[in-house]
Amino acid sequence: MRHRARKTLTALAAAIGLAGIGVSALAQPTATGGPEVMPYAVEDFPHSLQVMSWNMCGPQRSSYHCEGTGTPEDKANVVTTQVAVNRVEAVLLQEVCEDDLTLLMTKLGPGWSKAFDNYQWLNNDGTRKNSRCGEDTGRADRIGTAIVVKGQIIDARTYPTTQPTAGQQTPFHCATASNWDVRLCTVHATRVGANPNNPTQDFRGQQFTEIKTIVDTFPKTVFGGDFNSRSPDDPKNPAPGVWPVGLYSTGPSTPGYQECDQNGSSRTGRPTHTTAATGTTPAIEAKIDYIFSNQTRNWCTVTPTSKSDHSIIIESVTISG
């Protein structure tokens, strides 16, 4: 049953923040990339879990090209707005600065938990250093990925995946949301060109296969993030073979995991990332962010925001008993 958007309740939910939210306000679209209309009221799915995935584009280091995407306060407010309006209860973050994560947790309050793991840079001599949020003379807090959950998390751990022999190292880590007994994992796959010694080297196929092997062991799971790959049925994908058989399903009751924005058997979806235009090239939009689950999908939203070059994805799933 579809519900009409209730503007008064939405405004109230946004105004009062997180404490005492007792309304099922439906999100309203805004010109600045605010919450997209939620297609169902959450009361329709009493055993649901709303999971948000977002590459925050949080670094202040120029190599990440995140200039002009807002302040740490702005980015934290994007998350808390989705919590208040779309009833998000778990968040999978990429490119989040550690101090900004602390700010977000303060805003969310004591009823929330987090798991964080940082990116590292692997030098040619085998030594490692933590990736900084700022330039070498700027912010020194670490940058990485995070899992944020309403309630307690248990068994937070990082799983080994194949990484470049030099250059940026990105973790794959998971944690169990105890309120739902579901395993949540955040992904930031290695982009092509991450190894400065071999810019054509591609680790995505190995990483996706390893991720599939790991999540296949979880009875109930939701995993998502920035996969740095177009979807396998996207005709513009130059390397669809990086997606292993049995990861991305071809529809209900087929092997693999249904993706949040998947429609029928087509393994595609709305764009989630925009590469800015230059003087010689136009802007490029592509779907490279995903949420997968082995639980029943209720609804999915994909919402662009001016606070990152990545859209916000939210999936509501019904958690099996």
Residues covered by each model-derived region:
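N-terminal, active-site-proximal structural segment of metallo-dependent hydrolase catalytic domains
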Residues: R2-A13, A19-L108, W121-N124, G321
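Structured beta-strand-rich core segments of catalytic domains in phosphoester-bond hydrolases
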Residues: G34, A41-E43, V96-D181, A189, ...
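Metal-dependent phosphoester-hydrolase catalytic domains
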Residues: G34-E36, Y40, V215-V222, S229-G321
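Active-site-proximal beta-strand elements of phosphoester/diester hydrolases
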Residues: P46-H65, R157-Y159, C174, D181-R191
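Active-site beta-strand/loop signature of hydrolases that rely on acidic residues for catalysis
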Residues: Q50-M56, V79-M105, V148, A175, ...
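Sequence contexts marking disulfide-bonded cysteines in secreted/extracellular proteins
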Residues: M56-G58, H65-E67, E98, R132-G134, ...
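Soluble or luminal CAZymes and related metallo-dependent hydrolases
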Residues: G70-V78, V96, A140, P164-T170, ...
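Active-site-proximal segments of metal-dependent phosphoesterases and phosphodiesterases across multiple
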Residues: A189-E210, S231-S249
